[in-house]
Amino acid sequence: MNALNKIPFTRALYHFSRFRSFTTSGWIMSGHNKWSKIKHKKSANDQARSLQIGKLSQGIILAVRQEGANPELNMRLATLLESAKKISMPKSGIENAINRGLGTAGSEGSQVHFIEYEAMHPSGVGLIVEAVTDNRARAASSIKHILRNHGASLSTVKFLFSKKGKVEVNLPPEKRDSMKFEDVLDDAIEAGAEDIVNRPKEYIDEEDEGEFLILTEPSSLNQVAHHFRSKNYEIKDSRLIHIPLEETAIDVPAKDSVREDIQKLIDDLYENEDVMFIHLSILNSHFLPILDE
């Protein structure tokens, strides 16, 4: 299924004394995991696995650089290490990625850089492309080439977005049959979160994505993630994302040629070894940064 064609469910707003608004919404597209697209290709092969491991390694490097090497304190790193375990990523590769993130002398590989590219699609959709690379020139050249092939060009677009923290969780295993959405909502309020999205089961990739997405202020990300972990929720993802501002977000209709071209653009970008995440100024696109086949 082309995830762009998934239809959003009804959104309802909840207002509390803290003046935070919590939302429930349908999941428009598959989740944020940049390697899930590779994993789900019908013709998985050694090359696809190599790219998958490479992106996991980049993610670990970035997570360690941003929040440190202790998975007890770094929720993003903890989820990446769990993903690495599931695909049997070599222990030596994991250790080297952690050391590179720390900048430890003797770690294998060149220095890595985190780069964000801002671009505008001809349709008016803005993109923020996040890359982790050990070769700035290679990354810039290849990413610009992909953008040009789809008529997009580098342009300032960050003003179209707001930065937020995102935590994806599954219900505590021992409470799966007894907990209701209201219980998760209460936990989100207690954690100091801003919004929560209840994700329909048919929109979930069980390995990579959570049943609930919680949005936070960037500074509260670790606090909220730790709160949910302390209540035995399974943390599927925890990181910073760019959310399009509602007043400037583009509403791209279903069966629109723009959808098809953006689908192809993002497919091509995610095939690039340096690209980690892509954010779009499409309405509700904080639910849809990866477009699955």
Swiss-Prot record:
Pfam families: TACO1_YebC_N, Transcrip_reg. It is found in: Mitochondrion. The keyword tRNA-binding does not apply. Its main location: mitochondrion. GO terms for biological process: positive regulation of mitochondrial translation. Keywords: Mitochondrion. One of its GO terms (cellular component) is mitochondrion. GO terms for molecular function: translation activator activity. Belongs to the TACO1 family. This is Probable transcriptional regulatory protein C8D2.12c. It comes from Schizosaccharomyces pombe (strain 972 / ATCC 24843) (Fission yeast).
